[in-house]
Amino acid sequence: EIKYLFVKKSHLIREIKVALPSKKSYEIALKKHSSSSFAEKIGIPVPKTFRVNDKKELDDIVSELSYPVVVKGERGDSSSHVRYAHDFDQLKRSFDEVFQLEKNIESASLPPMIQEYIGGPTYLTQALSQNGKVKIIVPHYKFREWPITGGVSSRAKTIIEPRLVEYMTRMLESLDWHGEAGMEWKYDKNRDDFFFLEMNPRFEGSLDLAVKSNVNFPSLLIDLMDDKNISDDLIYSPSVHYRWLFRYDFRCFLHNEFGISTLLMESIDPRINGELSIEDLGLLRCFWKSPFNEITNFIRRSN
């Protein structure tokens, strides 16, 4: 994991190159408690958040809660440490469950936080910064995600959204960020604003979409590690569609997130990019079993 580079980098072979922010900034970004507090401090909208020291203190905030609420741990990938509670009993159970998951992670030290639920839709921004200056931000809209309650993009498109760019720029420059980063957002139509959910100090799972929109983040990161000056004139292509059918979206289909007609129409829509194109037919042998395995596992879980 990246955190070990901060511990070991002074002992690494001199020729090994990295592109990292400061250890303090990295730890703020890594932990959801810290990144949410930091975003709020610099004026970025965040969901209403309650922080308690243990389950007993949930009684102190019960009158202030409006269900559903989100129980969110410090860590956890792809929303694995996130639960949704629709009443107080479920909140207590979810708190215990997430807290137990957190105890299995060395760097997680705080109890779960309770957040206001914002229905969405969900947006994601990917960026690269050099010595505190943002070089490029690529925002995208999530049509679908896996798990369907919130997670990795499974069908998305790049968009133009100045507010997301402004919020992410403010966050990264306030952290004096160096390297790649991603941030997730929810849009609340009643307040007509975007709310910060979390920051990932790494490449996002939806990296393919950014690359397809003409921003090759891995190549730019290599340039960053080589101490090359990154251009201020990088431009991404908006309205680029992408679907991660084999990895995620077929699971959404199996869980009735969309129907067979959508599956077929999106499969033949030339505007929608994916893991494979006609030029990649030679790679199909690596993927063709995946949907069948998903169907088999789905049937087994249903029985």
Give the ranges of each region predicted by the language model.
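Glycine-rich phosphate-binding loop of ATP-grasp-fold ATP-dependent ligases
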Residues: 46-51, 69-97, 122-126, 145-156
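Conserved metal-phosphate-binding beta-hairpin within the catalytic cores
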Residues: 173-209
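Phosphate-binding site of ATP-dependent enzymes
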Residues: 93-147, 156-171, 187, 194-195
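Peripheral (often C-terminal) accessory segments that flank ATP-dependent C-N-forming ligase machineries
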Residues: 58-61, 223-303
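Glycine-rich phosphate/pyrophosphate-binding beta-alpha loops
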Residues: 79, 143-147, 153-155, 200-214
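Flexible, glycine/charged-enriched surface loops at secondary-structure junctions
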Residues: 108-109, 113, 178-182, 231-237
